[in-house]
């Protein structure tokens, strides 16, 4: 029973992240709905709904919601990880990065970018509709013409949050309940599912 509880606890970080997304998104959509009803020139329900849909489909709206979620999630999960696991980190992990480590990270990042491109191409070849959906998603959040807020979220805040949630908290808890290789597969699977689309899900799982 205790082991089962530990396994179930592995899902808590991902579930909390999903809950935070809804907690941020629902009020934002509510404010957008109010904005639609108070839009100048909207004289009917249809006009108000059109204005509302225009608001929530803009890149700025989606970027703002993403940034708000990312900021809240970063604070929550960084505090959780610090309080629960900071003292268990090896001493060499706590030391500042040196030049060879930074250089190695940069080389790895470039290599992973190439691998990601191949994975995306392979996945899209299996089902072109997956790539079409992903392309529409990228366009809807403004990644084709990113703003400063979206760049900060996509390059810094979002990746750090995801690392804390999955390769941080989820993996740490999973290793308490199962062998490392199963724990690693579980966090990778949850990481992929969390993206809610096949293209990102596949390369998130593999990489």
Please name every model-derived segment.
Residues 1-103, 110:
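N-terminal, membrane-interfacial amphipathic/helix-forming hydrophobic leader that caps
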């Amino acid at each position: 029973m205790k082991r089962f509880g530990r396994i179930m606890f592995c899902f808590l970080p991902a579930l909390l992240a999903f809950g935070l997304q809804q907690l941020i998104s629902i009020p934002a959509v509510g404010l957008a709905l109010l904005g639609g009803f108070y839009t100048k020139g909207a004289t009917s329900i249809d006009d108000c709904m059109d204005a509302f849909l225009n608001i929530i489909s803009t890149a700025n709206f989606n970027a703002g919601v993403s940034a708000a979620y990312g900021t809240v999630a970063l604070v929550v999960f960084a505090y959780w990880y610090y309080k629960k696991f900071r003292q268990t980190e090896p001493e060499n992990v706590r030391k500042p990065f040196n030049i060879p480590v930074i250089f190695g990270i940069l080389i790895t990042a470039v290599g992973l970018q190439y691998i990601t491109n191949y994975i995306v191409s392979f996945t899209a070849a299996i089902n072109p509709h997956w790539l079409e959906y992903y392309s529409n998603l990228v366009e809807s959040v403004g990644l084709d013409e990113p703003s400063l807020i979206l760049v900060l979220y996509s390059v810094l805040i979002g990746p750090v949050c995801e690392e804390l949630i999955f390769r941080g908290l989820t993996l740490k808890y999973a290793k308490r309940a199962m062998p490392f290789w199963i724990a690693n597969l579980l966090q990778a699977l949850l990481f992929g599912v969390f993206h809610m689309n096949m293209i990102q899900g596949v390369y998130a799982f593999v990489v």
